[in-house]
Every structure is written in C-alpha cells, then in structure tokens.
C-alpha cells in the first residue's frame, strides 16, 4: 500500500471571524483514508500564516496509516462544523488537502461538486495545486494555504 497522508483544511466562506477546521487522517478497516475523530477548530487572524501552518503541521504529525479501530458515531458535519448535513458543509466551507504521497508534499484546492469536494481546475483545466520540493515550513504552508483560499473566494465572487 502506498504511503499517503492527507490533512483536511476547511475554511468557512467568510472574510472576517471565519472558522478553520483542520483534521488529521488515518485508515478505515478496509484501508481507505478516513478522518480521525479529533482535530483543530480555530478562529485565527487570516494574516497569522505561521500559526495556521503550525496547526496544519500538528494535524500532519497526527496523521498516519494506522487503522482507526474506534470511530465516533457522531457525523463529521456535526462533530467539526456544527452543521446538520454534509451538504451544508460543502455550501458553507472551502476545502484544501495537504498531502504527502510517496514523498511528494502538495496542497490541492477543492471545489463543491454536488454533495462532495473535488479538485478545482483553472482556466487551462489544470488542478489548482502547489507542489513543494520538500516539507514546507509552517510559514510557507500557512501562507500558501491562505493564498489558495483567497484565490477560491475570488473565483466564487466573495471578494474582488
């Protein structure tokens, strides 16, 4: 099995006083990537790039390939987002994945597609992502993640 680590980073679609939800991952019993039952819910200053990067790095360090033996019965949309359906999460949040796949670190910007998130493509039909030559510092990671969220907010017309 390939070594794959994924950290989910969700930002509420608000310019001020937004919620940031950062969750580590493990494996389900059948080997699929699964969100762990804990994470970070924060209301950071959007310019505090290093602190945002540190929170993402914490979740990255918590992520692994171990099987999650005991999982909460509380649905993820209620547990982390205080929403009553995952559709509300896809409507109210933008999502980025920070990934490590076979030694390559990258972040991928996602978009809503029905009731799920899929890779966002730019005007050239290329995925909006950033590949790092090595593990990024907290400052680099936080800066790039917030730049990508800003790009998505412009794409959605939330900011000009």
Q: For the regions a protein language model found, what residue spans apply to each?
A:
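Intrinsically disordered, low-complexity regulatory segments enriched in Ser/Thr/Pro
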Residues: 1-47, 101-143
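Phenylalanine-focused residue identity feature
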Residues: 18, 49, 60, 80, ...
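Arginine residue identity/basic-tract feature
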Residues: 19, 27-29, 79, 87, ...
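Generic signature of intrinsically disordered, low-complexity segments enriched in small/polar residues
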Residues: 21, 89, 96, 108, ...
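Negatively charged, low-complexity tracts enriched in Asp/Glu with abundant Ser/Thr
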Residues: 42-94
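Ampiphathic alpha-helical segments that act as solvent-exposed interaction surfaces
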Residues: 43-66, 124-160
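Short, solvent-exposed interaction modules
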Residues: 73-118, 122
